[in-house]
Amino acid sequence: MILAIDVGNTNLVLALGSEAGSVDSVWRISTDAVTSADACSKAIRKTLGTKLEEVDNSVIASVVPAITRHVATAMEGVTGRAPLVVGESGVDLGIAVNIDRPEQAGADRVVNAVGAQVHHQLPAVILDFGTATTLDLVGADGAYEGGIIAPGVALSIEALERAAAQLPKLELRAFGDDLPVLGKNTVAAMESGVFWGYVSMIEGLLARLRSADAPASADMPAIVTGGLAPLFARHLAGAVMVDQDLTVKGLLAIFARNTEARHDEGNDG
C-alpha cells in the first residue's frame, strides 16, 4: 500500500491507502517533532507500528520546505524507494493551475483540487480548515482557478490571546448549535466571536464565489475538509459535503497517475 503524507505547518497527516483511492488508516504527527530525517523516521515507525509493514511506496505534499527533505529521506529509508514528492520536477499533477504564478500554488491546495477532480462533482469550492482557512475554486473542467487565504481558527485565537492581556485562554471545543451570538461573559463573547464570526466569514466568501462569473456557478457545492470541517460544515448554506480525506485522496490519485505514466514509458521502451 501507499503511505500518503501531507506535511502541514502544524501536523504531518499520514494515511495508508491504495492507488484506487481507498483510505485504510490515518495518523497525525506534530510537525515540530520532525527535526531531522532520523527523528522523522523514528516518529513514523512509532506511530504506524506493525502497519508500517504494509507500506510499499510513499507520496508527499509539503508546505514546509525546511522539513520536506527530512520526510523524503525518512521514507526512502523506510521503504527502500524514493518517495514521489509533489512539486518536484517530472511529477505530473494532471491538473491545470490557472493562476498568475502556478509554481507558487500551495502543494496542499493543488492536491485538494486533484482530490476534488477525481472524487467529486465540479465545479466546486474546497474549504480547508488548517493553520490557514482556505477556499479554492475548481472549475467544471477540473482546473484549479485560484482561491482565498484567511487566518485559521486556532491562529486567530492565539493572536487574540497574545494581543489582549485581559482576555483568558480560549479552548477550541465542539460548540453546539445553541451557542448564543450574544455572550453574557468574557468567554462566551469570545466563543461567539470565533465560532459565529468564522461561520459568517465563510458564508460570505462562499456567497461571493458562487455569484462570481464562470468558472464558478451559483449551485456549486462546497467540499469541506480539515480538522474542524464537521464543526462548521453543518452551519453553511447551500450544497455542502464533508470529506476529511480529500488531501489524501488527491495524493493517492497523483501517485497512481505517475505510476501509470512510468509503466507506460517502460512498455514503450
Segments (PLM) and residue ranges:
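Short glycine-rich, Thr/Ser-proximal phosphate-binding strand/loop in the N-terminal lobe
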Residues: I2-K46, T50-L52, A143-Q166, A188
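Glycine-rich beta-strand-to-loop/alpha-helix junction loops that act as flexible
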Residues: N57-P65, F129-T131, M220-A229
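Residue-level signal for inorganic ion chemistry
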Residues: L14, I60, G130, L160, ...
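ATP-binding/phosphotransfer module of carbohydrate and carboxylate kinases, centering on a glycine-rich
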Residues: M1-A4, T31, T35, S156-G269
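Glycine-rich phosphate-binding loop and adjoining helix at the ATP-binding site
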Residues: A39, V63-H120, L236-A256
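Phosphate-binding/catalytic loop of phosphoryl-transfer enzymes
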Residues: R81-A163, F195-R208, D268
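Phosphate/pyrophosphate-binding loops at sites that engage ATP/ADP/AMP, CoA/4′-phosphopantetheine
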Residues: A43-N57, V78, L205-M220
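Short glycine-aspartate micro-motif
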Residues: I2-D6, V59, A124-D128, T134, ...
